[in-house]
């Protein structure tokens, strides 16, 4: 299966449309959203073309392919308008033997086993780090990137994670994991 992984749309219809365009081009089986979907939050400036209703319409059009976790800017009202579950604090995936813990990143995760992958957003900065044997990965932010990082998302296919620039769809980082036997 092919997965598209994104985080921190924050209600930007402009960048959500770019994500939808990339979704159409990439043709993933699933879109994993790591939270902060509709609201920009009190610490962020309004993103370009802040229009949560348009974001709702775009994401609901692909609701059958969505897997989503709650971000610190998401709430019960969001669930009333979205056609896919969006309020779980985390999701655990086993993909080709990779144990992947998906969360937004604003809450401390449960204790993970060495070799596990922690996939989260929240910081708006793409990341790939080994933290005490746990691989931490962040796709960056769709709409409000920080620290001069690009508007970005990730692709997971055949145990290879690829970070992509949302503006150019070009790859700028990748990490391959061995497939389980």
Q: PLM ranges: what are they?
A:
Residues 2-95:
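Core catalytic region of metal-dependent phosphoesterases/phosphodiesterases
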Residues 84-87, 96-165, 170-172, 177:
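Conserved beta-sheet core of the metallophosphoesterase superfamily
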Residues 179-181:
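Non-catalytic terminal accessory segments
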């Amino acid at each position: 299966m092919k997965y598209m992984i994104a985080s921190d749309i924050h209600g930007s219809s402009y960048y959500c449309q770019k994500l939808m365009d990339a979704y159409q081009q990439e043709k993933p089986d699933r879109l994993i959203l790591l939270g902060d979907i509709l609201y920009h939050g009190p610490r962020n400036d309004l993103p370009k073309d802040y229009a949560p209703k348009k974001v709702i319409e775009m994401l609901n059009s692909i609701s059958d392919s969505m897997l989503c976790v709650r971000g610190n800017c998401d709430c019960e009202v969001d669930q009333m308008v979205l056609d896919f579950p969006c309020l779980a604090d985390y999701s655990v995936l086993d993909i080709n033997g990779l144990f992947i813990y998906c969360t937004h990143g604003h809450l401390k995760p449960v204790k993970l086993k060495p070799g596990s992958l922690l996939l989260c957003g929240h910081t708006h900065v793409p990341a790939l780090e080994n933290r005490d044997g746990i691989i931490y990965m962040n796709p960056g932010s769709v709409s409000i990137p920080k620290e001069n990082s690009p508007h970005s998302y990730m692709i997971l296919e055949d145990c290879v994670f690829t970070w992509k620039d949302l503006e150019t769809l070009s790859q700028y980082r990748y990490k391959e994991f061995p497939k389980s036997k």
